Structures are given as structure tokens and as C-alpha cells.
Amino acid sequence: MKKKILFGLLCATAGLSLASCGGRDTSHTIVFWNTMGDNLQQVLNPAIEDFEKKYPGWTVESSQIGDYDDVRNQTISYIAAGKNPDLVYCYPDHVALYNKSKQVVDLNTYINDPELGYTEEQIADFVEGYYDEGSAYGDGAMYTLPFSKSTEVLYYNKTVFEEQNLDVPTTWEEMEDVIRILKLRFPESIPLGIDSEDNLFITTAAQKDAPYTSATGDSHYLFDNEQNRATVQMFKDWYDKRYMTTKYIYGTYTSGLFVSTSSERSFMSIGSTGGASHQVPDKNAFEVGISPIPTFEGTDLKCISQGPSLCMLKQASEEKMEMTWRFMKEFLLTTEFQAEFSMASGYNPVLKSTFALPAYEAFLSNATGTEEGITALSAQACLTLSETNSFFVSDAFVGSSTARTEVGKIIQNVLKLGTSLDEAFATAITNCNKDN
């Protein structure tokens, strides 16, 4: 059995063939590139062993290739060299780049196969927002399946909220009232921290149903509109009153401000469910609560879908692609594996049936706002969001990654540098069009 964890480039140069790495024949080896550290590789190893027992003669080589950007960059290099890995962690904008050379497998070929594919009931078991990400490319194809997901939630200091008799805000309008009150009662505080300016812009645009981007049409970049400008101006007003800060302004993740017990602290933090363990103070100095992020009055709640999906890259061998599909479907996207991986990683399962598994129900029963139970509390919040179908994904295309970065910069520049709305939005549109 060949299971190998690598922490850099798989070979010295991208021009080397996969088969030449160590002089091995990889014709019956599924090469799987991901970002899993040792603890998650230990969760993955039994799935690999089970696959290799069921299909003698086939092996899986799992390799940690740094972070998500490293996986993307190395995959692009190997595609250019004509040496595709079989299965890779991906985000939607990564897939759009890979598909410039038409190297991503349309999974509909397998999903709809009467023997290899999914039934309607099995498809319905996927959390809808996670599953829909695979077809967000504007061409009708299905390029990815979800693997492990996260979203953003509102972490709040439950102890302070109860002491101050404050309700947790469910709308941005309520948020403004709460942060105003907290600032009055705790003058040195910065009541609200935001971990991602990019997500803040994209999510609030989705909540307002305001144009952001489109994978089709003559213009991809639609985010310069009055609705989005009004939202940025709202956050600018809050920042000027020291009601809020962001990762860029604070200099690091605002969870550090949230878990602080000094006078300069925050009482709410909008961050990833995947980072729930970082939102708990030392020695459980206060209890943490988790709530959905606010939305605007009169709008539906929408929460961004994040975390890695899986995509298959084209191979000369049809048999190898089929075996890659079998490994993915039969061993990674199962209720049992999803439960184990979620409990170990803190990311959310992608199958709804996982939440009914006795072991996972026991895990959720330990949900508390403490160090011991925060991961389960985070997963519990995500279960609620999945039941209300609140997750969304943005269109993916070549240039969508640039758009994401540029809208985040709008918030950064307007808040911290005092850039005018006209200049900030115009610069962002110009930079997007340069890279299109």
C-alpha cells in the first residue's frame, strides 16, 4: 500500500511525469492532492485501506501539497506539462483556471450512470448549497462534488450579552443598535470584528440580491451598483465610530480581539466555522455563543459556502478515471467517513444523513460554548443553516478569484484609507478587467 504525505512539490519540477517520481509506475495508483495534515491523513488512511482491499491491484497516494493555493499552483503546472493528478482539492475559481485547457472531468458522466452513479435520493442527501457549487460555471456541467465545508457565523460573548440583557442581532439593522449600545457601555471596545472583507462584501450583496458577478454575458463584473455602495458606506460609518474592525485593519484574524479579556476587545466576531476552536478564550474566561450571520430586514438569510470540493482531472485511461470516481463516491462521500472527518477537522459534513448517525448525534450533544464543545456547537449551527437551505455560491469563471479579491479591497480602502466610493469601485472594476 502506498500512502505518502508530501509537504512541498511532489517532484522537483512540474515538468517531471507523475510516473517518474521515484521511478514508480502510477498506472494503477490514484494520485490525490490535498491539504490534509497528519491528523486528517490518519482519518483518510482507513478509507484508502478499504479501497485497496476492495479493488486489489489499485492504490491511492495521498499527498499534502501545502495550502489551497499551493494545490492550485502545482495542479496548473502539471496540467501545463500534460501530467494531470487524478483527484484534487479545489475551490470554484481553481476549477475555472484548470478548465481553460478543458482538463476537468464533467462528473455528470458518472453521476448519471445507471451502475456507477447516484440515485435521486442519494443526490438529495447532499446539502443542496454545497452540491450546487459543482455546477456554478455557467455551462451546464458538473465539475466538482463537495468534500468538507464551512461557512461564516456570528460568534458572540454569551456571558456579556446575558449580563447586559442584549439580544443577539439577526439583522444588520439590529446589529447597528447592539454595537452602539456596547460601545457606550464599554468605550474602549471595538464591538464587532470581521475576519474576511471579501466574504463580507459578497455575502451582503447576495443577501440584498444585488448584482456581484456573472459567469455568462458580456460583462462578468456587476458589483458596482447603488445597493453595494450603500452597504460599504454603512460599514464605513460603523468603522469611523470604532464600532467594528476587520482582519486587514486589525492586522490578523479578529478572533484575537474577540477572545481578549482586556478593555480593548470585541464582543462579536464573524468568522469561519472551520476556525471555531480559535474563538474560545483561554480557560473558558467567558461562554461563547454561535448564531447565523445577520441579514438585512426583509431579506432571506444567505451564508457563503466555503471549504474544499473534489474534482477529477482527465486521464488517458478510462479505467483509471472510473476507479478515481469509485474511490471518491464509495469511500470519501459516505455517511460514516463524513462523520469521522467532520469530528476531526471541525468542517461540516456534506451529507445530511451524517447528522442522523448515532456517533455524530453524540458528538453534537456535547455542543457548548467552551473549548471542549465549540466545534460541535459550530456544527450544530451549520445543521440549522443546511435545513433552511441558506448556503449560496457565486459564479465561477476565469477572473472570479480577482473579483473576490478586489471587492474585499473596496472595503479595506474605503474604511482604512478613506478612499471615496467612486474611486474604490472604479479601481476594482479596472483591476478585474485587466485580468479578464
Regions found by a protein language model. Give the residues of each.
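Short, well-ordered beta-strand elements
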Residues: 26-37, 58-63, 87
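Extracytoplasmic/periplasmic substrate-binding proteins
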Residues: 35, 48, 200-207, 233-326, ...
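Mature extracytoplasmic/periplasmic domains
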Residues: 43, 112, 274-278, 308-401
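Extracytoplasmic "Venus flytrap"/periplasmic binding protein-like
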Residues: 50-126, 159, 163-170, 260-268, ...
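Hinge/lid segment of periplasmic solute-binding proteins
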Residues: 93-151, 204-206, 289-294, 369-382
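Short, solvent-exposed loop/beta-turn-alpha elements that line the ligand-binding surface or hinge
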Residues: 108-126, 210-230, 281-282, 295-303, ...
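C-terminal capping/gating helix-and-loop segments adjacent to ligand/active sites or protein-protein/ligand interfaces
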Residues: 137, 304, 370-431
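Glycine-centered hinge/linker elements that transmit conformational signals in sensory
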Residues: 179-181, 218-249
